[in-house]
Each structure stands twice: as structure tokens, then as C-alpha cells.
Amino acid sequence: MRHQCIQIPFKVNLLNKYFISGNHLSQLGELSGYYCVKDIHQRMLQHPIGQRILNDKPRVTPQTFKIEELLKLDENTFGHQYGKFMKDRDFSSGERPIVKYIPDLELAYVYQRYKEIHDFIHVLLMYDVSVYDEIVVKWFEMAQLGLPSATLSAFVGSFKLNCQEKQKLMETLPQILKRAHKSEFIMNVYFEEHINTDITQLRKSLRLL
């Protein structure tokens, strides 16, 4: 029997009201995603790399991923491409809010990790941060992780697109969903160990190409 913390109509109303405020979406995700986060936690426990991530609990912060240092790496590395992505958009990994509404510390870390690797997913999938690109990434996250916040962003966000973007999304969805289902489980990727990895090789090893 599947559990739901918040009824869908209530969540849709929230998303419409705040679309898409980072803080409100983050709170919504924590409140509605508890049982999905438990499922993600179990999948991580069943994988050796996932186990190491849960044991080490690495964080993605301005201190652990120093942009200026990343930009000194070879241009073809994952680290350099992530650093360029963040610098070009004036983003900071420190802007991600801390999980507050998941009382279990282990599950709170899992959800924090999900939020902190979001920009890595953008880089790996080669999608920017426009509304259209963000929605495509949310469809990928929905297919892989099943989180209610990603699901609502994917579906409700699609209505915010213009006609041309909606048509483009319909053409893109089969491919992005296929990539989500065939690729490695993104929460079991120890990104910190791939800073110097050629980004094309990383995409291939994760079956994202």
C-alpha cells in the first residue's frame, strides 16, 4: 500500500501559487517525498557505491567544489564543465537550502544529496537552466527517482511552456525517459571521484549517451 503525505490537489495548488520558488518547492519536496526518499535510501544501501556515499556523506558546497580550482582542470573533464556551468550562470552550490522537514537524519541526508547533485545532472544531460531545460531535467529525475516534487514540476511546469516549447518537449520526452531508465541510478554516482574524468567517458559509463 503506497502512502501519500499530502494530497495531490493541495500540492498542485501550492506549486501553482509558488511556481517555481526554490524555497517553497524544496519544502514541498521534503513534506511530500518521505516514502520515495526511503525507497531511494534502500536502493543506495543495495549498491556498493551507494553504501559508500551513505557512509561518507559527501557534501556539494563552495568549499568542497571550489569553482576557480575546477576551472584549472582540463576543459574536457567533468570538474571543469561543472565549474564552467556554475560560473557562467553565477550559481553557487551554497544556495541549496538545508533539509529541515525530514526528521530521520539518514533520510534527510539522502534528500540533501539529491538537491545538491541537481546541477551535476544538468551538466551530464547537457541541458541549460531555462524553464524548458529545467522541465526536461525534472522529467529525468521523475523517471529515475519518482519524487513527488520532480513529478509535479515535470507535469505542472509543462503547462507554462509556449506552443513551440510544448511540441519540442513532446519530441524530447521519449528520449529523456529512455535515458533515465537505461542509465545508472544517479544517486549511486560518487561524483566527487569523477572530477578529473573525461565528461564524455563519464556519460558513456553512466549510459547517458
UniProtKB/Swiss-Prot annotation:
Name this protein carries in UniProt: Ubiquinone biosynthesis protein COQ4 homolog 2, mitochondrial
Keywords from the UniProt entry: Lyase, Membrane, Metal-binding, Mitochondrion, Mitochondrion inner membrane, Ubiquinone biosynthesis, Zinc
Database matches in InterPro entries: Coq4, Coq4_euk
Species this chain originates from: Paramecium tetraurelia
Membrane topology: Peripheral membrane protein
Family the entry assigns: Belongs to the COQ4 family.
More info: This protein may be expected to contain an N-terminal transit peptide but none has been predicted.
Complex formation: Component of a multi-subunit COQ enzyme complex.
Enzyme Commission number, as recorded: 4.1.1.130
Binding sites annotated in the UniProt record for Zn(2+): 118-119, 122, 134
Pfam families linked: Coq4
Catalytic class of the enzyme: lyase
Subcellular localization: Mitochondrion inner membrane
Its biological purpose: Lyase that catalyzes the C1-decarboxylation of 4-hydroxy-3-methoxy-5-(all-trans-polyprenyl)benzoic acid into 2-methoxy-6-(all-trans-polyprenyl)phenol during ubiquinone biosynthesis.
Cofactors (names): Zn(2+)
GO BP term, example: ubiquinone biosynthetic process
Domain of life assignment: Eukaryota
Pathway: Cofactor biosynthesis; ubiquinone biosynthesis
Reaction(s) catalysed (UniProt annotation): a 4-hydroxy-3-methoxy-5-(all-trans-polyprenyl)benzoate + H(+) = a 2-methoxy-6-(all-trans-polyprenyl)phenol + CO2
GO (cellular component) term, any one: extrinsic component of mitochondrial inner membrane
